[in-house]
Regions:
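Short Asp/Glu-rich motifs
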Residues: 56, 88, 125-126, 155
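Conserved, well-ordered alpha-helix/loop/beta-strand core segments that scaffold catalytic motifs
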Residues: 94-123, 127-137
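Short beta-strands and strand-loop turn motifs
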Residues: 84, 114-118, 143-146
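A metal-dependent hydrolase metal-coordination microenvironment
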Residues: 1-60, 139, 145-179
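Hydrophobic, aromatic-enriched interface-forming segments
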Residues: 40-100
Length: 179
């Protein structure tokens, strides 16, 4: 599971439409999670749900549900709600796209494609980013996110060296998803 970032893409291109389709699928999955939680005895205020689903520009996530669970006193924090009550519910695996498709669409839309938080990938999957970087470059990766809130200073030095040696673009980000 890789996170790819598209910079400078055209607003109404193929990647935009693919993201809109994914957003729509995620809304359906979020609706299903809420239905399941209600069946398990959790209560949701109708007005809160109406407001949540009226945000058409927003890609709904489990974090949105977690915030409501905290509001209703079902958990002390968003992280607690996310990691306990919502842990059994998987969304990401149901709305993924192949990396080659994503990079191709970003390129068709005149964008550049960046591999997000490579340090996180290494830690989660126990792989060395160098083992997959050449394959990623072949499918269109233009750069890597060197500066990231999850990267240690040593990670930053290492990824900066890797990017420079391979003439890859260098970016930074926080990986903040509202939690």
């Amino acid at each position: 599971k890789l996170h790819l970032l598209g910079y400078g893409i055209e607003k109404d291109g193929g990647i935009y439409h693919m993201c809109e389709d994914i957003k729509s699928k995620k809304r359906e999955l979020i609706h299903g999670i809420i239905d399941s939680l209600i069946a398990r005895g959790y209560r949701f205020d109708k007005k809160d749900l109406e407001m949540l689903f009226s945000m058409n520009d927003k890609a709904l996530t489990k974090v949105d549900i977690a915030r409501l669970l905290v509001k209703y006193g079902e958990a002390r924090s968003v992280n607690e709600a996310y990691n306990t009550i919502l842990a059994p519910y998987k969304i990401g695996s149901k709305v993924r796209a192949e990396a080659s498709v994503v990079t191709s669409l970003i390129k068709e839309d005149n964008g550049i494609c960046i591999l997000a938080h490579p340090g996180d990938i290494e830690k989660k999957y126990g792989i060395d980013i160098l083992d997959i970087l050449d394959d990623l470059r072949k499918i269109g990766i233009d750069g890597i996110e060197v500066f990231n809130s999850k990267h240690t200073p040593e990670d930053v030095v290492r990824f900066l060296k890797i990017a420079k040696e391979r003439s890859l673009l260098i970016t930074g980000g926080s990986d903040y998803h509202g939690m």
